[in-house]
Every structure is written in C-alpha cells, then in structure tokens.
C-alpha cells in the first residue's frame, strides 16, 4: 500500500497558503491554511458562540447580499469558488473601512468580537497579508471593480442626478518615497500629498468612481480616464461640473461633441480671458448682477468654446468678473447661479465620508492604494443602503460616528441554530425600525429575489434578534 502515501499532495485547488495573522495584540504568527481548515475553524468558532461589540457590523450582511459584494470580490481576486481565502481578506478590508480604523494593525484589537467571523475567517490578517494581496492586483483590475460596482449601484437607483461633480481631492501621505511636497490649499502647510480625482453624483451625493494622479499622470489624463469609466456606469446624459484646473485642451476637445456628457467649469484668471470678459455687453438680471456670452478659442486650436461671464457690482469701479467655459447649451444664468453652486456639495461628501479611507495614505504603491480605496467604495455603498433603513437622526451621522456608535457600540452575541446564524443585539438604537427591516431577514431577502445564503459564511443564513 506504499503507493498510496501522500496522495493528499495531489488534491487539486486546495494547496495550503501561508498567511500572517494576529495571535494577540502584540504577537503575530504565520499559519498554513486551505479551504478545509478555514471552514472547519469558522464553524468551530460559531459552535462555541461569540460575544462582542462589533455585532452592529453584521447588519451590513443583508446589504452585501443585495449589492452582490461577494461576486465583486471574487471577480476582483480571480477566485474560482467560494471557499478561497483571497475574497475573505478583501472583505476584511471592506469592514475595516466601515469601522474607520487607522494606524498599524498591531495597535488594533479587532479580534474575538465578531469581526473576523463576519469576514468568513477564523483570524484577523496582518498588514503583510493584506499588502501582499493588494500588490498582486493591478490598477486596471481596481478600475474594473469600480465600474462593476457603479453599474450595480446605478441599477439600484443610487445615482439619480443630471449632474456629475468632479473634484481633485488631496490625501495626506506619510510615504517615505521622494516626491514633491504640495499645498492642499493656499493656507495649508507644504507636505506630501496623494492627489485623487473623485466623481460624485450631484443629486444623491454618492461616489461614482475615482482616479489617482501621479508624477506620470497629468490632470487631463486622470480626468479623461475617469470620464471613460463614467460612460460605462451612467446610462443617461449628464453635465459634468469641474474645477478650473480641468481647463485643458484635451478635456474640451474630448467633450466638445460628446453625446453623453457636457461640461461646465470656471476658467483660470488669465489676462486674455479677463480682457475679453470686460469688453462684452452685459444683460442685467437683477441689481448688481449681469451676464454675457461669447466664444473663446484656446491658443493654437481650431475649436471654439462657449464662454459665459457673470458680472457683479453696481458701478464700474467695483465690477467683478467671473467667467465659465462650457459645452452645454443650457441658459447661461441658470448655469452660473443655479447649477454650478451644486458643485460645492462634494465638500460635504469628503467631510462626512473621508474617514472610510480617503483622509490619509500610508503608502504610494499605486496597486495598493487603488485596491484599498476601491474597498472603501464598497464599504460606503453598503453603509449608504443601511442608512436608508435607519431613523433620520442616525442616517445623518458621519462615517466616523456610524463606526463608533453603531458598528462598534452595540453589544451582542452570535449563535447557530440549524442553517441560520442568529445575531442578537442588545440596547440597539431605533430598535423598532431595525426590527422592521432585519428580523426574519432571510424571508425578506427571498421576497426581494435575493438568495439569503451567505457564501463567505458557508451558505449559512443570517437572522437578527433585538433585546
């Protein structure tokens, strides 16, 4: 029978992987895992029951199933079946973003509170394991993930507006790489920044996609790449509201005859444009406000663009001119007074949601940053769906408040009953509203046409009790 020895080594698709995990707050250990050991250890943890303060995160499971998060993550990781570890590590990143955790993982205490089990893991992976996963996936794969997520969100009605807000958002970075320091604003100190470009739906305030600038990627390149992804995500026409730094030949030439997108942006305060604005004949709209229109041609270009100008002030001595360039044919006064001011709503998005992962960057490795920020997009999407089911005084909380008071601030326990994981939450806020949406969750999901089995929890269903 010697010929039968070590046949397990030839078992297909189940080779063990080395993963670094947290053992305690200060100790780490590299362990060998495969799909069988993962399932065995997770089932053992559930059989022993779990108590902790992270059970509020389990309310996101229903939203994950509705948003098809698992399909997105398995596609991004290239996993062929549901028992692999890579999409579970990606799910850990999504839930870390939801908790707004920052700093080095050695300083965190996420273990044994229901967090790792939620990810379908018997442990919390370390920075090394997470960075190895992210570094193996390219920028193109992260962009494809953004498009797939955006298409799902569009189908679910998350994007309703006629306007898309595009804004450069600078993230502080503590990377040791040599890079030119910049100012995030005229009043801020000079420091290393990572420049990102976000596209936000103008009506719902929800993010569509993002790009990252680097030394080799100019503003025009990053913006046009972002607009290309928007064309796959949005099924309808939209007006893009941009900043003056997007005033480039490449962007205008691309959008001049675009059938889906038009653009509106303030022009830079150049002497040539100011002289042209001052020479126009203005039409008064109300006291101290007048508008005018002309065409403008960039130097060396054959194409001309619509130049609209607003003039404020009552007398010639205190006139102030502000000009905009656009490819839209909407009324000029409406564009400048009603539509463009909506662009500043994007600042509200960064103020409320940046703690999910858009406020600091520890590395400038682009594979890692694109992957990490894309996981934060998924976290923001499922939290948005959860917010719509909460009371008004809670759904207006910032991402950080949601993490502290809701996801980490509710005591509870987990136990298994037949094919269900029963999650009990004690002293949850707005309990009657939560009962309405989450008690008997499997039945509610089936009524919506959603499979209630959770693939990363080995097809267990999840139900909730509130006490």
Residue ranges and their predicted role:
Residues 382-415:
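Conserved nucleotidyltransferase catalytic core and NTase-mimicking acidic/glycine-rich helix/loop elements
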Residues 93, 107, 126, 130, ...:
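Short, conserved catalytic/metal-binding motifs centered on acidic residues
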């Amino acid at each position: 029978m010697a010929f039968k020895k070590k046949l397990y080594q030839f078992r297909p698709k189940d080779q063990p992987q080395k993963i670094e995990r947290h053992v305690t707050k200060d100790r780490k250990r590299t362990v060998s895992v495969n799909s069988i050991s993962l399932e065995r250890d997770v089932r053992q943890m559930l059989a022993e029951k779990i108590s902790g303060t992270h059970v509020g995160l389990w309310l996101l499971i229903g939203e994950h199933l509705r948003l098809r998060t698992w399909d997105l993550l398995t596609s991004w990781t290239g996993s062929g079946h549901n028992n692999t570890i890579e999409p579970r590590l990606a799910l850990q990143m999504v839930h870390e973003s939801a908790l707004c955790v920052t700093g080095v993982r050695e300083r965190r205490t996420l273990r044994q509170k229901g967090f790792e089990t939620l990810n379908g893991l018997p442990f919390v992976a370390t920075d090394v394991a997470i960075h190895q996963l992210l570094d193996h996936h390219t920028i193109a794969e992260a962009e494809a993930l953004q498009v797939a997520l955006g298409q799902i969100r569009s189908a679910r009605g998350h994007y309703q507006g006629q306007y898309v807000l595009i804004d450069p958002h600078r993230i502080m970075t503590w990377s040791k790489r040599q890079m030119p320091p910049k100012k995030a604003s005229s009043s801020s100190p000079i420091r290393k920044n990572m420049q990102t470009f976000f596209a936000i739906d103008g009506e719902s305030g929800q993010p569509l996609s993002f790009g990252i600038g680097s030394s080799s990627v100019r503003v025009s390149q990053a913006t046009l790449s972002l607009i290309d992804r928007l064309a796959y995500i949005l099924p309808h026409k939209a007006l893009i509201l941009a900043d003056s730094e997007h005033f480039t030949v490449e962007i205008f030439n691309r959008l001049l005859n675009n059938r889906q997108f038009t653009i509106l942006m303030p022009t830079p305060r150049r002497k040539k444009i100011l002289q042209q604005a001052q020479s126009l004949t203005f039409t008064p709209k109300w006291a101290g406000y007048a508008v005018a229109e002309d065409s403008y041609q960039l130097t060396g270009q054959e194409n001309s663009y619509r130049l609209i100008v607003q003039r404020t002030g009552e007398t010639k001595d205190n006139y102030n001119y502000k000009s905009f360039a656009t490819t839209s044919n909407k009324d000029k006064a409406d564009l400048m007074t009603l539509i463009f001011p909506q662009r500043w709503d994007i600042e509200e998005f960064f103020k409320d949601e940046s703690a999910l992962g858009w406020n600091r960057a520890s590395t400038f490795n682009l594979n890692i940053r694109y992957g990490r920020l894309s996981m934060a997009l998924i976290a923001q999407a499922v939290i948005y769906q959860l917010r719509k089911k909460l009371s008004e005084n809670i759904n207006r909380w910032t991402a950080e408040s949601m993490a502290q008071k809701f996801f980490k601030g509710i005591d509870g326990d987990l136990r298994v009953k037949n094919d269900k994981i029963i999650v009990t939450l004690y002293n949850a806020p707005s309990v009657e509203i939560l009962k309405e949406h989450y008690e008997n969750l499997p039945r509610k999901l089936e009524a919506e046409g959603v499979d209630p089995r959770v693939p990363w929890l080995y097809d267990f269903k999840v139900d909730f009790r509130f006490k």
